[in-house]
Amino acid sequence: MGLPWYRVHTVVLNDPGRLISVHLMHTALVAGWAGSMALYELAIFDSSDAVLNPMWRQGMFVLPFMARLGVTSSWNGWSVTGETGLDPGFWSFEGVAAAHIVLSGLLFLAAVWHWVFWDLELFVDPRTGESALDLPKMFGIHLFLSGLLCFGFGAFHLTGVWGPGMWVSDPYGLTGHVQPVAPEWGPAGFNPFNPGGVVAHHIAAGIVGIIAGLFHLTVRPPERLYKALRMGNIETVLSSSIAAVFFAAFVVAGTMWYGNATTPIELFGPTRYQWDKGYFQEEIQRRVDSQLAEGASLSEAWSTIPEKLAFYDYVGNSPAKGGLFRTGAMNSGDGIAQEWIGHPIFKDKEGRELEVRRMPNFFETFPVIMTDADGVVRADIPFRRSESKFSVEQTGVTVSFYGGALDGQTFSNPSDVKKFARKAQLGEGFDFDTETFNSDGVFRTSPRGWFTFGHAVFALLFFFGHIWHGSRTLFRDVFAGVDPGLEEQVEFGVFAKVGDLSTRKEA
């Protein structure tokens, strides 16, 4: 038939059996990739430090999605939350990966069967003996089944009735764990950070889907609507399916980038807005002030700050810091975090406490500026020493550390002070191992950034695909000159062109 590469799907346009086959093969490829990718990530994953070297720092992509649904342990005995010596049974990371690979093989065999046995009685109208698909009925079946799945996921898996529940945590991502979640049916269920709303909405949406599916199975569409929306054309199915997919892709791109209820920061890393707002910095300061009010010293107060919370308050963990085309995990950029060095407090020779202005998300380089409590610049690291008025040497800045590895130490050597000021510009300071991965010092984004970028791009492409195929099916008679009411059957897989006398008709 000599089809160009971009028209090859024409061969399944009038062939329901092989249309099923190629969809089965596609699902086999997806399941096979997911299982294989999970095994690859498990092979390179370092589970030794769940606090400073979590999965999102290591560039894991499929493991976080497994963990948020309740799979958190490995047959090697470790858990995402840091425990060791565990026996998770079959439903471990490896077990789920193996299940996907086995499923992929079964789907492959099903695809082969349907490719060979394509001409089934199922696709023939018994009244006329002609090939026919009842697309509105198929729509009802799919709607009913997807509603059933949605309801089952919410009512059983998430609630813990028959399943593990879901990943829940505190607002600062410190206590994350998997637990059953009760549905929240009140106004609080609409709080985007309330996991109970996720459960309630899956149950509600599932019920709506089941009812809608039964409706479409029992009620036929009006003839005018059937013809107006080309409900008898398989390309209508393609167009509306693409619409569902691109809409879902836009939604999940938004929830991934802006939210963390279903994309916990312990599994996917912080959002960029938490750095923009100083979200973790405010919580750290609140905890320190609370300790000071109870009579603790600065050293004691800062020593109560969890290392995990301090690590979130570091700009290198913001997904907006890595360029979209810098490949590799975050650890390939700044290195593997080893320890928190403590909180630095800078003072000039006048005794004023100075604060280093933090680097915004979208800057690669930023001037190191130290301001007093009133926001007045008192010291900096100048670009041109010849014109400097506020250099560390001129202003006599010193730095003292509270909490962390350098607790209680004070540095007055200008080169040391400048080194720690540059670290403070990036948030809380950490020592990094840059040798293990030959880290180049250039920030990378987290899986949160990859997922958002990928889904936003594909959503845009699929949006145009929806417009394209929707236009083709609505205006098929205009584009092809084929009457939409034409009932003459052509050979399966052969494209009927206008005035094409060579197209073989069925006997």
Swiss-Prot record:
Lumenal, thylakoid side: 40-94, 160-196, 256-450
Primary subcellular site in the record, as a coarse category: membrane
Transmembrane segments: 17-39, 95-116, 135-159, 197-218, 234-255, 451-474
Keywords: Chlorophyll, Chromophore, Membrane, Photosynthesis, Photosystem II, Thylakoid, Transmembrane, Transmembrane helix
Residue numbers on the Cytoplasmic membrane side: 2-16, 117-134, 219-233, 475-507
One cellular component (GO) term of this entry: plasma membrane-derived thylakoid photosystem II
Sample GO molecular function, one term: electron transporter, transferring electrons within the cyclic electron transport pathway of photosynthesis activity
One Gene Ontology term from the biological process aspect of the record: photosynthetic electron transport in photosystem II
NCBIfam families xref list: PS_II_CP47 (TIGR03039)
Protein's name according to its UniProt entry: Photosystem II CP47 reaction center protein
Source lineage: Bacteria, Bacillati, Cyanobacteriota, Cyanophyceae, Synechococcales
